[in-house]
């Protein structure tokens, strides 16, 4: 972003004047494995159902402001009443609204980096302080003891499970203890939960803790497992009183009619996505094993276990490798070398078998050449 003029600096709120916009560093390529999208084709029959729903949707009417048909379907899927679900324009809107409602000036967010950078960014937009409790620098596991020690002095907390970009899952007993230790709200971002186990995330989700902990919020998205990143649809599950807060502060009509129609059709066809998610998980393990073979053969490669649809990989001169993947092979991956604790790390989305083979073949050449 260009530097603001002096006049604009005087007009904008002082605490916002130096904030940089989120930049995913996107470049058009033949293979894009940089954004943790689901690159698989939409399951057979689902696209037709979505297209039919869109064709039947009038565009001259405002959408249902609460997306109630979609809420009902999501509630039925998760086994909760409608009053425990709120939809949003992607998970990002709900994440921002969480910080808007429960953060603010004089309050502090408990954050566990390396993690999704938008947590700290959105906190800065609503003047919320951030207390970072860093993950283990070698394993990237949560330092549960340190987090629980810091929690009483914080006003709200966010934990990602599986964590982006490291791929680890937060233990359920730890989440319960965090809800007890934190005096405010606790959000568990489960954007990648469907990839975490063989039950589409049902065995790993922290949703079952909501009955005991009314300060717990679970964040979901249709951008990952459902391959619907372009529709921008997310939702939260929480106690009805918490949902009332989300409903009160949300932007009116933030989930448009086309998104509601497409999302409803996709969620109704959720069983069709389970085989796709299972294949992504199998490919994740195959790619991880192939990278470990490179390491066993003496190449400077380190890869961590992951329960998401991505892998975090460390290699020599990662930024240069990423550039050569883009320029010589038309493959885009995400460079995290700029992030504290992630020196020489790339995050590689798990794609289709053909996409994965392409990136593995390229890395076998580039890692050796960049040693």
Regions found by a protein language model. Give the residues of each.
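N-terminal "arm"/small-domain region of PLP-dependent enzymes with the aminotransferase-like
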Residues: 2-61, 152-153
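Conserved PLP cofactor-binding pocket of PLP-dependent enzymes
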Residues: 14-16, 21, 304-306, 313, ...
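PLP-dependent aminotransferase class I/II
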Residues: 43, 66, 215-293, 302-303
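Phosphate-binding glycine-rich loop
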Residues: 68-108, 315, 319
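PLP-dependent aminotransferase-like
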Residues: 101-159
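Active-site pre-lysine segment of PLP-dependent enzymes
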Residues: 141-153, 165-186, 190-228, 241
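PLP-dependent enzyme catalytic core of the Aspartate aminotransferase-like
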Residues: 173, 327-328, 338-371
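Conserved PLP-binding catalytic core of the aspartate aminotransferase-like
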Residues: 281, 294-329
């Amino acid at each position: 972003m260009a530097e603001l003029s002096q006049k604009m600096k005087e007009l904008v709120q002082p605490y916002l004047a130096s904030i940089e916009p989120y930049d995913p560093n996107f470049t058009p390529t033949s293979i894009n494995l940089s954004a943790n999208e689901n690159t698989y084709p939409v399951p057979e029959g689902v696209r037709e159902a979505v297209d039919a729903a869109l064709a039947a949707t009038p565009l001259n009417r405002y959408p249902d402001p609460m997306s109630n048909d979609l809420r009902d379907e999501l509630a039925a899927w998760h086994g909760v009443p409608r009053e425990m679900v709120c939809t949003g324009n992607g998970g990002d809107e709900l994440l921002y609204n969480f910080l808007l409602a429960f953060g603010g000036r004089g309050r502090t967010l408990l954050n566990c980096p390396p993690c999704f950078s938008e947590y700290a960014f959105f906190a800065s937009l609503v003047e919320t302080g951030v207390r970072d409790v860093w993950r283990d620098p070698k394993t990237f596991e949560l330092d549960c003891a340190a987090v629980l020690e810091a929690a009483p002095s914080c006003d709200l907390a966010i934990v990602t499970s599986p964590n982006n970009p490291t791929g680890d899952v937060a233990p359920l007993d730890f989440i319960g203890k965090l809800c007890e230790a934190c005096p405010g709200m606790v959000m568990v971002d489960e954007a990648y939960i469907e990839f975490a186990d063989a039950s589409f995330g049902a065995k790993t989700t922290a949703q079952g803790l909501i009955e005991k902990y009314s300060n717990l919020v679970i964040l979901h998205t249709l951008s990952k497992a459902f391959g619907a990143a372009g529709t921008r649809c997310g939702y939260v599950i929480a106690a009805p009183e918490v949902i009332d807060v989300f409903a009160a502060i949300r932007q009116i009509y933030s989930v448009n009619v086309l998104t509601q129609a497409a999302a409803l059709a996709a969620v109704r066809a959720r069983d069709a996505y389970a085989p796709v998610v299972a294949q992504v998980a199998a490919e994740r393990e195959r790619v991880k094993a192939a990278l470990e073979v490179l390491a066993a053969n003496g190449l400077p490669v380190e890869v961590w276990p992951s329960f998401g649809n991505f892998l975090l990989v460390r290699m020599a001169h990662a930024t240069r490798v990423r550039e050569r993947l883009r320029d010589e092979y038309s493959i885009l991956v995400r460079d995290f070398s700029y992030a504290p604790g992630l020196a020489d790390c790339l995050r590689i989305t798990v794609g289709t078998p053909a996409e994965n083979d392409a990136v593995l073949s390229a890395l076998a050449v580039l890692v050796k050449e960049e040693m």
